[in-house]
Amino acid sequence: MPSFSPTLLKLAAAALSALLLSGVAASATSRIKDLANIEGVRQNQLIGYGLVVGLNGTGDTLNNIPFTKQSLQAMLERMGVNIRGATIRTGNVAAVMVTGNLPAFATQGTRMDVTVSALGDAKNLQGGTLLVTPLLGADGNVYAVAQGSLAIGGFQAEGEAAKITRGVPTVGRIANGAIIEREIEFALNRLPNVRLALRNADFTTAKRIAAAVNDFLGTKSAEPIDPSTVQLSIPAEFKGNAVAFLTEIEQLQVEPDQAAKIIIDERSGIIVMGRDVRVATVAVAQGNLTVSISESPQVSQPNPLSRGRTTVTPNSRIGVTEDGKKLALVKDGVSLQQLVDGLNGLGIGPRDLIGILQAIKAAGAIEADIEVM
């Protein structure tokens, strides 16, 4: 579990308090571009199976990984090398899966990054070269072809009695390692209307986006369909030029509405609360009970000429201490900053604060959803 110095915690608390105060003072606005995506404009995932060669004995064990051996034989036969019946002994080849994201509106001949991951028992892909690997989409068509030298973020070194590993040496990346061979057709300029898909579904935010667009255009061209979708009808002056229309729309400022939510990460003790968190009237008390037990055995030694026996007498000390905390009353409609200040005034740490927030929620006095990660 990570530990932080008291000084670092104080600095973080001060920075968080300043941020919270500034957030309460003025509501932030965001561009529509940062709140929603254009429906249909997205990346597409690609995947392929290939071979990495040139490894320094750290590749797959062919006797243990049959698909690597079969792939190597098939590749050599396509190259005109007949090895049927021959015994292949090499540790310089590894079977890999190649993945990448085809960007929206990617044109034929442009390049994209790919990630290469070992599929067998290869120990290290350092220094390897990926051979030509077709990348397929969900429809089974080839959209790109990848090949190139791998860049590995981790490493592994071992001797006869010790081994050290840093990072993940069985995963590599090839920057601009794939060439796009097929384009995905998407006639944006011929669409009569466009839909905006909100990244965080919310009725109020969807309505505000539609209102901002209508105010900008002077017509009712935008309509919220549901909490996550706003439909835009392209005006006559932008017909056939949806790019110019969307460029103007994306820059409009909207104040998004946020649901009152508290995010709790119990593993690290991190608590994140939104600005709209409110609590009803509730009394909070917190105390810690500590039980300490110490053992100090006493040895009884008889006189040298006596016939007595040395004995050990147990001696236990039990102490009970309780940190007394005052009962604090949290008034109705308290804001986030007031809640944090009040709980800090009780000397409550992050771990105890998690339990208190859950208890307040169970009592029905907190107006927010609590999400535990």
UniProtKB/Swiss-Prot annotation:
Location(s) in or outside the cell: Periplasm; Bacterial flagellum basal body
Keyword entries, A-Z: Bacterial flagellum, Periplasm, Signal
One GO molecular-function entry: structural molecule activity
Name of a matching Pfam family: FlgI
Chief location: periplasm
A Gene Ontology cellular-component term: outer membrane-bounded periplasmic space
Superkingdom assignment: Bacteria
GO terms (BP aspect): bacterial-type flagellum-dependent cell motility
Keyword flag Signal: yes
Signal peptide residues on this chain, from the entry's feature table: 1-27
Assembly mode: The basal body constitutes a major portion of the flagellar organelle and consists of four rings (L,P,S, and M) mounted on a central rod.
Task of the protein: Assembles around the rod to form the L-ring and probably protects the motor/basal body from shearing forces during rotation.
Family label: Belongs to the FlgI family.
Listed name of the protein: Flagellar P-ring protein
